[in-house]
């Protein structure tokens, strides 16, 4: 949510501001290189016209009008010359240096300086000359056997174009001798295997082996990963893809050995890393609960739970874990999952207030409140033990206010009634300002969203938009809540109209612009729990409006 008050969603945005570009110094474009953007920088001013007198500067051949309207023809044909082998001295840079670096060192250590010059170099730069044609492309007649026999397999695997060649010619048939030759050469040395996994190109050929490995090869690959820094592989941008593919494609018993190795190490960094988080998500999603029960027990400890939930990536992992634990109660392992879920939810409820006030952890509490099925009992516990008696303070917090909104929306009738009563009558008025909780929230930058949610709930009920069918006594209670909010808004309408949030509150109340009733008289047609066109007036007059309800006072 956002409005002019500056409230934004608590999830961090990845977009960047362009204000820096709008105020950038554009003197470099004014046609003068004296001073300006270059006067105080370390960027060298190259004299590409030579060091001699300007009257001896190079002059191009004169041109005449060509038959082609888009071209000019040279009067004096130029003589073809060999490749130019220029040095810094040819540009007046014989004594050029940056700090203590020579020109050669400067260009070697500053790839951005030479990046534009070398941008036309093909991706086949790592391939041997015999493997490419005159255009720099891989030869059409090249075979996989040629690559292996010439000892260029690693060169191809580390090259973007070369690895595509290997993937196209990969021998998927386990009976093919070349399959075993490739596997042995790429995995026999731990350093080579690790380098390929961490390479932007090489990881693809390793994934290919993972996908088509025999059971024996799967065992060997698992040993290679465990012996060559499994945690580091999970944290790497490219190697983590190999681990994910292994969990997805390997036999379950073999994949569980990878997870067992992770559980024996310090895997807390994996829970908060942008790359490693995908590995753990694969584990939770694809493997049986017995493989990752250690992770749930790890989260049940308060310090670990707070560390993971307060991370932008970790909070999503916790949500997925809760979802998997509460999923499909008909499975035979549900009792085990329910025990682990109960331990995790106990820890969440115990730290609910701190979690709700955090930028990312509040999403975990929201997720519990919005879940259904077996999670409803934990939703009610969180509302009763954490939110009640703290609604006013939490509604004024940037992140906890999201939790309060969700609680109003998903609370069962009895708890919803208690929450409404707390806002209306649960706090002593301020002695100096004579303001109660509703007055405070109406004008608060975050609390006003809670009031808007209260209004929305009342309107949905009174217009018959609620999924469940409500009795008349419940409808009267919703009408009473709506009437109290409307009277308070009317009292402060002059001040509320000064703010965009106040205008939204006034507009939302106008959606139900009909006088309220709080008497025991039969309900008016507009307040019936179902659409009027579906109910006859004769049926409504016979309704008994005095049925008992959990809302009856």
UniProtKB/Swiss-Prot annotation:
Chain intervals for the UniProt region annotation (RNA-binding): 499-514
Matches recorded under Gene3D superfamilies: Leucine-rich Repeat Variant (1.25.10.10)
Tissues with expression: Detected in differentiating oocytes with highest levels observed in developing ooctyes in the distal portion of the proximal gonad.
Keyword match Cell cycle: yes
Extent of the Pumilio repeats: 146-184, 185-223, 224-260, 261-296, 297-335, 347-384, 386-421, 432-472
Gene knockout outcome: Production of viable embryos and predominantly normal oocytes with a low percentage showing misorganization. Does not affect germline development in adult hermaphrodites. Impaired repression of glp-1 and fog-1. Simultaneous knockdown of puf-5, puf-6 and puf-7 results in abnormally small oocytes, disorganization of oocyte nuclei and cells, inefficient yolk uptake by oocytes, embryonic arrest with impaired eggshell formation and cytokinesis defects, impaired repression of glp-1 in late oogenesis, and mislocalization of rme-2 to the cytoplasm instead of the plasma membrane.
The keyword Lipoprotein is assigned to this record: no
UniProt-listed GO biological process terms: cell division; oogenesis; positive regulation of embryonic development; post-transcriptional regulation of gene expression; regulation of translation
UniProt cross-references to InterPro entries, sorted A to Z: ARM-like, ARM-type_fold, PUM-HD, Pumilio_RNA-bd_rpt
Molecular-function annotations in GO: mRNA 3'-UTR binding
Subcellular location(s) of the protein: Cytoplasm; Cytoplasm, P-body
UniProt keyword list: Cell cycle, Cell division, Cytoplasm, Developmental protein, Differentiation, Oogenesis, Repeat, RNA-binding, Translation regulation
GO cellular component, one term: cytoplasm
Primary location class: cytoplasm
Domain of life of the organism encoding this protein: Eukaryota
One Pfam family from the record: PUF
Function in brief: RNA-binding protein that binds to the consensus sequence 5'-CUCUGUAUCUUGU-3' in mRNA 3'-UTRs and modulates mRNA expression and stability. Functions redundantly with puf-6 and puf-7 in oocyte formation and organization, early embryonic cell divisions, and repression of expression of glp-1 and other maternal mRNAs in late oogenesis.
Protein name as it appears in the record: Pumilio domain-containing protein 5
């Amino acid at each position: 949510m956002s409005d002019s008050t500056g409230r934004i969603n608590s999830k961090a945005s990845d977009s960047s501001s362009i204000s820096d570009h709008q105020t950038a110094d554009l003197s470099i474009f004014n046609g003068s290189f004296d001073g300006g953007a270059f006067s105080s920088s370390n960027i060298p001013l190259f004299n590409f016209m030579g060091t001699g007198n300007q009257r001896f500067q190079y002059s191009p051949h004169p041109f005449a009008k060509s038959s082609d309207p888009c071209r000019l023809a040279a009067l004096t044909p130029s003589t073809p010359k060999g490749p130019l082998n220029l040095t810094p001295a040819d540009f007046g840079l014989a004594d050029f240096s940056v700090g203590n670096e020579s020109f050669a060192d400067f260009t070697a250590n500053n790839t951005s300086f030479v990046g534009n010059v070398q941008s036309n170099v093909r991706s086949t730069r790592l391939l041997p000359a015999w493997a490419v044609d005159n255009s720099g492309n891989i030869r059409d007649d090249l075979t996989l056997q040629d690559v292996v026999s010439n000892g260029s397999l690693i060169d191809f695997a580390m090259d973007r174009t070369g690895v595509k060649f290997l993937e196209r010619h990969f021998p998927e048939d386990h009976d093919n001798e070349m399959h075993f030759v490739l596997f042995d050469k790429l995995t026999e040395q731990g350093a080579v295997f690790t380098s390929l996994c961490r390479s932007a190109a090489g990881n693809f050929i390793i994934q290919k082996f993972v996908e088509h490995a025999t059971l024996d090869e799967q065992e060997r690959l698992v040993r290679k990963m465990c012996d060559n820094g499994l945690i580091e592989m999970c944290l790497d941008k490219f190697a983590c893809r190999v681990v994910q593919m292994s969990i997805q494609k390997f036999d379950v018993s073999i994949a569980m050995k990878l997870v067992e190795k992770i559980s024996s190490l310090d895997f807390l960094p994996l829970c908060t890393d942008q790359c490693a988080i995908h590995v753990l998500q694969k584990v939770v999603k694809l493997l049986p609960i017995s493989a990752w029960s250690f992770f749930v027990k790890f989260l049940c400890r308060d310090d670990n739970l707070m560390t993971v939930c307060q991370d932008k990536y970790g909070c999503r992992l916790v949500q997925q874990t809760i979802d998997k634990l509460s999923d499909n109660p008909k499975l035979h392992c549900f009792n085990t999952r329910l025990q682990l879920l109960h331990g995790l939810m106990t820890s969440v409820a115990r730290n609910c207030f701190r979690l709700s006030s955090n930028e990312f952890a509040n999403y975990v509490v929201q997720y519990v409140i919005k879940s259904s099925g077996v999670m409803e009992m934990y939703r009610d516990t969180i509302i009763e033990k954490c939110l009640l008696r703290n609604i006013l303070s939490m509604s004024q917090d940037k992140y906890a206010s999201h939790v309060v909104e969700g609680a109003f929306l998903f609370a069962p009738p009895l708890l919803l009634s208690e929450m409404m009563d707390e806002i209306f009558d649960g706090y002593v008025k301020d002695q100096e300002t004579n303001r109660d909780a509703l007055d405070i929230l109406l004008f608060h930058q975050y609390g006003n969203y809670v009031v808007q949610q209260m209004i929305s709930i009342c309107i949905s009920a009174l217009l018959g938009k609620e999924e469940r069918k409500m009795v008349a006594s419940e409808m009267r209670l919703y009408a009473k809540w709506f009437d109290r909010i409307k009277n308070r808004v009317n009292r402060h309408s002059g001040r509320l109209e000064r703010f965009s949030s106040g205008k939204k509150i006034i507009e939302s109340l106008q959606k139900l612009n009909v006088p309220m009733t709080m008497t025991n008289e039969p309900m008016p047609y507009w307040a019936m729990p179902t659409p009027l066109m579906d109910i006859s007036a004769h049926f409504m007059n016979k309704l008994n409006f005095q049925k008992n309800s959990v809302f009856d006072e």
